[in-house]
Amino acid sequence: SNGLINQAKRQAEVNIASIRESVMERGLPVLGTSSTCTFTLRDEYPHLLGIDTSDVRDSVELATRYIYRLLESGKAKLRFRKDAPKVKVAYHTPCHMEKLGWSYYSIELLKMIPSVELTVLDSQCCGIAGTYGFKKENYETSQAIGEGLFRQIEATGCDVVATDCETCKWQIEMS
C-alpha cells in the first residue's frame, strides 16, 4: 500500500518458499490469525505481485476456519468452565473476511462458548485500510469511515469486541 513493490515481491517470494517447505515437504497446514495476512498469502500475492501460490493456496487458512473444521470432523472437542462469567461480545467482520467468505467460522466458534452473549455487527469498514488510517493526513477520513461501526459497537453495550484483523482491532481500540 506504500508503493514498495520490489521489496514486497522479495518478501513474498521468501514467504512462499517457506510456506512451500511447510506444506509440500512436511505436510503441515499454514494457519493465520489475521484475515488480511491470510488473504494476502492466498490471493493477493498472485494478483498484485504475480507470484504463483496455486500449489499451496488451499493449505493456507485462517486459524478459526481450521479449528471449526477440526471440531466439525470430531478430531477435536471443546470444554468450558461451568462457572465462567457471562461476557457480551460484539463481532466485527473485517473487509478481508468478507472477501474470503470465512466470517461464518469465527461467528460459529464464538456461538459455541456458553458464556458468550454474541452480537454480530452489521458489516461495515472500520476505516483503517492497512496503514492508511495511521497516517496523520488520513486520520480524520479514517475515523469518519469507521464512525458507523463505532456507533454500532457502543450501542451493543458489549464487554469485548472480537475481530479477525489486527488493524481493525487497533482502529476500534483507538476510536
Residue ranges and their predicted role:
Residues S1-S175:
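Iron-sulfur cluster-binding electron-transfer modules in prokaryotic oxidoreductases
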